Amino acid sequence: MKSITIKGSERESVGKVATKALRNAGAVPCVLYGGDQPVHFSADERAFKSLVYTPNAHTVVIEVEGGKSYNAVMQDIQVHPVTDKILHLDFYQLFEDKEVTMEVPVRIIGTSPGVLLGGVLRLNSRKLKVKALPANLPDFLDADISPLEMGNKIYVTALANEKYKILHPENTVVCQVRISRAAMKAAQEAAKAAKAPAGKKKK
């Protein structure tokens, strides 16, 4: 999985006054969990844009003053309900030998015969939770729709891989090709025409 580097500074004070001052200065207060002790730090709000405002998933390298560096994933985010300004971020530290749970985006590949015939592709699950060692975290979960005919579905079992575990029930639908209204109407009209009685023969 691709990684983003965040450069920050350790926080000496974590009180409300200090937190407000950080935000007024354009910084975001953060906490890194998962190690022996939580690490409180802050970074410029602009540093998080490529991490937060994207559909892609990334791991993070947190570099703080003093030469300290931590591998992590974003665990939680708080944003202002009106301005969408980032208020706080929680991270979870990664270790090479310890599995981590993370949401990974689904990527559609291939061309569906059902779509070519007028069906509508519906993506039911844009992201799926997976559990894996950090080195095995995928950037995407590829869903190949090449075999999908009209009315067919792809379940999470089709995306299984020995390097990671998908944390969803086996009957979870990832995507499906639904019959469009136009195609359904055409099929109904064709069926009616086939059942209609033949016209009377002239004498």
Swiss-Prot record:
Signal peptide: none annotated. One of its GO terms (cellular component) is cytosolic large ribosomal subunit. One of its GO terms (molecular function) is 5S rRNA binding. One of its GO terms (biological process) is translation. Disulfide bonds: none annotated. Keywords: Ribonucleoprotein, Ribosomal protein, RNA-binding, rRNA-binding. InterPro entries: Rbsml_bL25/Gln-tRNA_synth_N, Ribosomal_bL25/Gln-tRNA_synth, Ribosomal_bL25_b-dom, Ribosomal_bL25_C, Ribosomal_bL25_long, Ribosomal_L25_dom, Ribosomal_uL5_bac-type. This is one of the proteins that binds to the 5S RNA in the ribosome where it forms part of the central protuberance. Belongs to the bacterial ribosomal protein bL25 family. CTC subfamily. Part of the 50S ribosomal subunit; part of the 5S rRNA/L5/L18/L25 subcomplex. Contacts the 5S rRNA. Binds to the 5S rRNA independently of L5 and L18. This is Large ribosomal subunit protein bL25.
